[in-house]
């Protein structure tokens, strides 16, 4: 960085400290990743200066001929990756992508069937503290109490009983594959639209390592970060027949000008997905998650559903006698970043929880392999089992430092 250190030392210092935190700690928050330098360069480009309300070829501002090219590249690449008929890359976030779909097909008070937040769903799938739960009549489905897999019979029975206008599949803390075909069949039986929020698994879907919802769903929403390893943002994929309505819901419906610098970064990251190396990366993400799960289980740490099919693992802490809030703080002290997370049928409050969610997308981008994940799992088990033993925690902290030193991050950055 050339100008920021002199112009704004306070902000520069905070950025430096965050850079150091990312280097010195093991990032296991399942919704985070490390983008490439090329993605960061695109996002920090002169495109941040350009207003471009509207869509390519139909803008409300002049001078959009070059940003039109960028947005078309992003849309075309997304279509190619996911086999979608229509794509909108303008949503600023996954939440706004979901909002746009709801505004396209729902009226205030319509019934929607979505996954219970504490069972792995998302705030925008009907939580009463979110706009979705305020605007619409959400009915919740969840996971089976024994298997902790989605209870498709429960989904079917609730769909038959409540006749929702929309069924939402997808999750923020569900470690198993989702059967989109079953959801489609249920939606067809009751005459509902079907939407999939694939924010967490989009990178796995992109290269065929998780079933693709696009052939089954009327609408698919996603973030562009997480396993897709792009900039923070959202995207909607849908059938051609809904394309113009979706566009109108985004602009002028819920957004004004698109963030063209972010859309350029989306285009770059989609280009990276189309590179053959991305499939190897995504497979390593899954392999690392499975190795982490296996190591934790071998240490008698309980996992929701007993393991994982994707990038995330949900740890059930009840047998250890600690809460998610305590575990998050303990792990942060030794240099491992996670988030407390509710588990199915959780007796604790949302800000306390009985679980923590961990994911392998970021550490895999950093180069961690399965041997490294064995060590990570061993360190987590040590810290959680001995969370009040300062000597054990110091040992764990040293092992974290040894690991992070082996896998440097962003070597070419000059700050």
UniProtKB/Swiss-Prot annotation:
Binding positions ((6S)-5,6,7,8-tetrahydrofolate): 117, 121-123, 241
Family: Belongs to the SHMT family.
PANTHER family: SERINE HYDROXYMETHYLTRANSFERASE, SERINE HYDROXYMETHYLTRANSFERASE 1
Keyword Amino-acid biosynthesis: yes
Subunit structure: Homodimer.
Gene Ontology, cellular component aspect: cytosol
Cofactor annotation: pyridoxal 5'-phosphate
Subcellular localization, as worded in the UniProt entry: Cytoplasm
Pathway: One-carbon metabolism; tetrahydrofolate interconversion; Amino-acid biosynthesis; glycine biosynthesis; glycine from L-serine: step 1/1
Known catalytic reactions: (6R)-5,10-methylene-5,6,7,8-tetrahydrofolate + glycine + H2O = (6S)-5,6,7,8-tetrahydrofolate + L-serine
GO MF annotation terms: glycine hydroxymethyltransferase activity; pyridoxal phosphate binding
Function recorded in the entry: Catalyzes the reversible interconversion of serine and glycine with tetrahydrofolate (THF) serving as the one-carbon carrier. This reaction serves as the major source of one-carbon groups required for the biosynthesis of purines, thymidylate, methionine, and other important biomolecules. Also exhibits THF-independent aldolase activity toward beta-hydroxyamino acids, producing glycine and aldehydes, via a retro-aldol mechanism.
One Pfam match: SHMT
CDD domains registered for this protein in UniProt: SHMT
Top enzyme category: transferase
Name of this chain's protein: Serine hydroxymethyltransferase
EC number of this enzyme: 2.1.2.1
């Amino acid at each position: 960085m050339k100008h920021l250190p002199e112009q704004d030392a306070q902000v520069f210092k905070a950025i430096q400290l965050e850079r150091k935190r990312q280097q010195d700690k093991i990032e296991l928050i399942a919704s985070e990743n490390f983008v490439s330098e090329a993605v960061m360069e695109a996002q920090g480009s002169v495109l941040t200066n350009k207003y471009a309300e509207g869509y390519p070829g139909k803008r409300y501002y002049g001078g959009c001929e070059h940003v039109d090219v960028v947005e078309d590249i992003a849309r075309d690449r997304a279509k190619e990756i996911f086999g979608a008929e229509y794509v909108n890359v303008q949503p600023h976030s996954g939440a706004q992508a979901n909002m746009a779909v709801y505004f396209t097909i729902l009226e205030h008070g319509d019934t929607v069937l979505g996954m219970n937040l504490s069972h792995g769903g998302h705030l925008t799938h009907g939580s009463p503290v979110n706009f979705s739960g305020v605007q619409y009549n959400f009915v919740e489905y969840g996971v089976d109490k024994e298997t902790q897999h989605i209870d498709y019979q429960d989904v079917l029975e609730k769909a038959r009983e409540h006749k929702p206008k929309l069924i939402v599949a997808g999750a923020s803390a569900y470690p198993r594959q989702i059967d989109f075909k079953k959801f489609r069949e249920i939606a067809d039986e009751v005459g509902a639209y079907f939407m999939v929020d694939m924010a967490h698994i989009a990178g796995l879907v992109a290269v065929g390592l998780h079933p693709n919802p696009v052939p089954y769903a009327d609408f698919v929403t996603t973030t562009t970060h997480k396993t897709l390893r792009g900039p923070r943002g959202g995207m909607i994929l849908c059938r051609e027949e809904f394309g113009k309505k979706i566009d109108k819901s985004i602009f002028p419906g819920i957004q004004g000008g698109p963030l063209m610098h972010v859309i350029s970064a989306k285009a770059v990251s989609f280009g990276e997905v189309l590179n053959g190396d991305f499939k190897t990366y995504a497979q390593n993400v899954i392999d690392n998650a499975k190795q982490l799960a296996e190591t934790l289980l071998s240490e008698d740490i309980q996992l929701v559903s007993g393991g994982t099919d994707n990038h995330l693992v949900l740890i059930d802490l009840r047998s250890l006698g600690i809460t998610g809030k305590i575990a998050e703080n303990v792990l942060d002290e030794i240099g491992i970043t996670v988030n407390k997370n509710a588990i199915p049928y959780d007796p604790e409050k949302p800000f306390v929880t009985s679980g923590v969610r961990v994911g392998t997308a970021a550490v895999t981008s950093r180069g961690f392999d399965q041997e490294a994940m064995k060590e990570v799992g061993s360190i987590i088990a040590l810290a959680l089992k001995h969370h009040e033993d300062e000597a054990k925690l110091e040992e764990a902290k040293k092992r974290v430092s040894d690991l992070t030193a082996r896998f440097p991050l962003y070597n070419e950055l000059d700050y």
